[in-house]
């Protein structure tokens, strides 16, 4: 039986693990060969020392080797946050996914239930009537017929069951918050990824490059794992094999600046109702932040030339009813009914 203890000792001593060592350590954990105490100790040793790019890449390689895949078009993208930002905000990336799909870009959305917030992507989408436990074939059909499919992380990463108890007991963010957005079962090459802290912007952009992404924006919105309309968003963009960093304010793209309080969400049912309101065309601070993130996603997808163009397309997606139609189709297909 493989032993995690040498890797715990290495991490605890402050020594970085190579990509190969990191993959080996995660293989041990994901195959059920480590105790909950060992897993907790290893995760906290990495957290305290600070996870490195090779460690994250090795961990993702381990997760990807075990996942149940979903077939999606080559131009599909993911819009996802790491979670762990402790903000309790609305489900921005979930709402954004419908708007982007309504604008004509296939979305393979990867997400989970809340671990550190009151409502994760899966919680809100389930409250809307989407069957979050649909199988891989149904999700593939949802992407091709509705323009969007939701992949519930535990259904595709069943090996996570070995580490979930330790994560819940720790009650704090770990390397796994970073891994979810990097382990999309549809193996998308275009991503808009939100991170919970600015120090992860460039490292995650480098990991995505290492793992074969073509275009990606890694974003941090002044306390949110999304682009924000309540402050300044920092971006690390992977484009044409290069990584560049820049900042965006809502005013420079024609959006109203709001207060952080206006973006506060609630329980899943409340967030689902608010999400539906945005798709139905209601004006709000939630709509504005969704427009900003949708505009960025459309730039990443190659559908928009710039952020203002992307936002204009996002407005059209909502106001034409296209985004709402995507939601209705996804509900139907995920429950195995005709779209």
UniProtKB/Swiss-Prot annotation:
One of its GO terms (biological process) is L-tryptophan biosynthetic process. Binds 2 magnesium ions per monomer. Mg(2+) 2 binds at residues 225-226. It catalyses: N-(5-phospho-beta-D-ribosyl)anthranilate + diphosphate = 5-phospho-alpha-D-ribose 1-diphosphate + anthranilate. It comes from the Bacteria. Catalyzes the transfer of the phosphoribosyl group of 5-phosphorylribose-1-pyrophosphate (PRPP) to anthranilate to yield N-(5'-phosphoribosyl)-anthranilate (PRA). This is Anthranilate phosphoribosyltransferase. It comes from Brucella suis biovar 1 (strain 1330). The gene is trpD.
């Amino acid at each position: 039986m493989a032993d995690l203890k040498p890797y715990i000792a290495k991490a605890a001593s402050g020594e970085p693990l190579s990509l190969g060592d990191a993959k080996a350590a995660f293989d041990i954990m994901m195959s059920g060969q480590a105790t909950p105490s060992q897993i907790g100790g290893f995760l906290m040793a990495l957290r305290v020392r600070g996870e490195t790019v090779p460690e994250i890449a090795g961990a993702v390689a381990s997760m990807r080797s075990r996942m149940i895949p979903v077939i999606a078009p080559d131009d599909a993208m993911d819009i996802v946050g790491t979670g762990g930002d402790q903000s309790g905000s609305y489900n921005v990336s979930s709402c954004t996914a419908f708007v982007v799909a309504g604008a004509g870009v296939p979305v393979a959305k990867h997400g989970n239930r809340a671990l550190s917030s009151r409502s994760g992507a899966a919680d809100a989408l389930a409250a809307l009537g989407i069957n979050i436990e649909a199988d891989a074939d149904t999700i593939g059909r949802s992407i091709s017929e509705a323009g969007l499919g939701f992949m519930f992380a535990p259904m595709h990463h069943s090996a996570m069951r070995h580490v979930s108890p330790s994560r819940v007991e720790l009650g704090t963010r770990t390397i796994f918050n970073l891994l979810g957005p990097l382990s999309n079962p549809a193996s998308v090459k275009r991503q808009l990824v939100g991170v919970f802290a600015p120090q992860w912007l460039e490292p995650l952009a480098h990991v995505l490059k290492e793992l074969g992404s073509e275009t990606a924006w890694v974003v941090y919105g002044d306390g949110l794992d999304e682009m924000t309309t309540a402050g300044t968003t920092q971006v690390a963009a992977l484009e044409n094999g290069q990584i560049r960093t820049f900042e965006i304010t809502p005013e420079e793209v024609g959006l109203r600046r709001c207060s952080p309080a206006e973006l506060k969400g609630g329980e899943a049912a409340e967030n689902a109702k608010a999400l539906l309101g945005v798709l139905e065309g209601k004006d709000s601070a939630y709509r504005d932040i969704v427009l900003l993130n949708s505009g960025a996603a459309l730039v990443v997808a190659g559908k928009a030339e710039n952020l203002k163009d992307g936002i204009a397309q996002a407005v059209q997606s909502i106001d034409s009813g296209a985004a709402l139609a995507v939601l209705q189709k996804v509900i139907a297909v995920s429950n195995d009914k005709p779209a």
